[in-house]
Amino acid sequence: MRIILLGAPGAGKGTQAQFIMEKYGIPQISTGDMLRAAVKSGSELGKQAKDIMDAGKLVTDELVIALVKERIAQEDCRNGFLLDGFPRTIPQADAMKEAGINVDYVLEFDVPDELIVDRIVGRRVHAPSGRVYHVKFNPPKVEGKDDVTGEELTTRKDDQEETVRKRLVEYHQMTAPLIGYYSKEAEAGNTKYAKVDGTKQVAEVRADLEKILG
């Protein structure tokens, strides 16, 4: 089962990706992890990626596609894989198709921007332990304090409203066009496309995914 997850940052993809991996026994492929692993392994592609990154440039789509092809040929991808964060653009999706990387399901996590802002901006973190709270949805027992240690909670830089809104604008400009692209692919019978209501509770979203994926 080969799956692509689409949706804005904060739409709940990460939580559900974990569930899909465990339930269907497929690995999650993140381009960031893949690039780091390739550089570490010193493979031909890894060396190319390292040279580009050392020069402070963005890795080309061609190189990322080559890495994806190499990664999905590995044993743990025999039953499929889960792609999150790639493709991000229509040229990348086209390049994937040309490289013969077919996808069974494209799942779009649909959550209104304002709810995403609410979800992310309300996060509070206990940095030493990694415990995460939310002022509205999962508040600590004492406001601003970690439940276990009583230490101060902080807000991550990435969780500040200005940053979140900037990322949402980027998503709508760059990645949202993929929704139309994959809807057309589904109409042509090349993949299955499903919209998932990401505003529901985690368990409800999980149940919806089980219905879609079987």
From Swiss-Prot:
<comment type="pathway">
    <text>Purine metabolism; AMP biosynthesis via salvage pathway; AMP from ADP: step 1/1.</text>
</comment>
<feature type="binding site">
    <location>
        <begin position="57"/>
        <end position="59"/>
    </location>
    <ligand>
        <name>AMP</name>
    </ligand>
</feature>
<keyword id="KW-0808">Transferase</keyword>
<feature type="binding site">
    <location>
        <begin position="85"/>
        <end position="88"/>
    </location>
    <ligand>
        <name>AMP</name>
    </ligand>
</feature>
<dbReference type="GO" id="GO:0005524">
    <property type="term" value="F:ATP binding"/>
</dbReference>
<feature type="binding site">
    <location>
        <begin position="132"/>
        <end position="133"/>
    </location>
    <ligand>
        <name>ATP</name>
    </ligand>
</feature>
<keyword id="KW-0007">Acetylation</keyword>
<feature type="binding site">
    <location>
        <position position="167"/>
    </location>
    <ligand>
        <name>AMP</name>
    </ligand>
</feature>
<comment type="subunit">
    <text>Monomer.</text>
</comment>
<dbReference type="InterPro" id="IPR033690">
    <property type="entry name" value="Adenylat_kinase_CS"/>
</dbReference>
<comment type="function">
    <text>Catalyzes the reversible transfer of the terminal phosphate group between ATP and AMP. Plays an important role in cellular energy homeostasis and in adenine nucleotide metabolism.</text>
</comment>
<dbReference type="Pfam" id="PF00406">
    <property type="entry name" value="ADK"/>
</dbReference>
<feature type="binding site">
    <location>
        <position position="200"/>
    </location>
    <ligand>
        <name>ATP</name>
    </ligand>
</feature>
<feature type="binding site">
    <location>
        <position position="31"/>
    </location>
    <ligand>
        <name>AMP</name>
    </ligand>
</feature>
<feature type="binding site">
    <location>
        <position position="156"/>
    </location>
    <ligand>
        <name>AMP</name>
    </ligand>
</feature>
<dbReference type="GO" id="GO:0044209">
    <property type="term" value="P:AMP salvage"/>
</dbReference>
<feature type="binding site">
    <location>
        <begin position="10"/>
        <end position="15"/>
    </location>
    <ligand>
        <name>ATP</name>
    </ligand>
</feature>
<keyword id="KW-0545">Nucleotide biosynthesis</keyword>
<dbReference type="GO" id="GO:0005737">
    <property type="term" value="C:cytoplasm"/>
</dbReference>
<protein>
    <recommendedName>
        <fullName>Adenylate kinase</fullName>
        <ecNumber>2.7.4.3</ecNumber>
    </recommendedName>
</protein>
<keyword id="KW-0418">Kinase</keyword>
<feature type="binding site">
    <location>
        <position position="123"/>
    </location>
    <ligand>
        <name>ATP</name>
    </ligand>
</feature>
<keyword id="KW-0547">Nucleotide-binding</keyword>
<dbReference type="InterPro" id="IPR000850">
    <property type="entry name" value="Adenylat/UMP-CMP_kin"/>
</dbReference>
<feature type="modified residue" description="N6-acetyllysine">
    <location>
        <position position="192"/>
    </location>
</feature>
<feature type="region of interest" description="NMP">
    <location>
        <begin position="30"/>
        <end position="59"/>
    </location>
</feature>
<comment type="similarity">
    <text>Belongs to the adenylate kinase family.</text>
</comment>
<dbReference type="InterPro" id="IPR007862">
    <property type="entry name" value="Adenylate_kinase_lid-dom"/>
</dbReference>
<dbReference type="GO" id="GO:0004017">
    <property type="term" value="F:adenylate kinase activity"/>
</dbReference>
<dbReference type="Pfam" id="PF05191">
    <property type="entry name" value="ADK_lid"/>
</dbReference>
<keyword id="KW-0067">ATP-binding</keyword>
<feature type="binding site">
    <location>
        <position position="36"/>
    </location>
    <ligand>
        <name>AMP</name>
    </ligand>
</feature>
<feature type="binding site">
    <location>
        <position position="92"/>
    </location>
    <ligand>
        <name>AMP</name>
    </ligand>
</feature>
<dbReference type="InterPro" id="IPR006259">
    <property type="entry name" value="Adenyl_kin_sub"/>
</dbReference>
<dbReference type="InterPro" id="IPR027417">
    <property type="entry name" value="P-loop_NTPase"/>
</dbReference>
<keyword id="KW-0963">Cytoplasm</keyword>
<feature type="region of interest" description="LID">
    <location>
        <begin position="122"/>
        <end position="159"/>
    </location>
</feature>
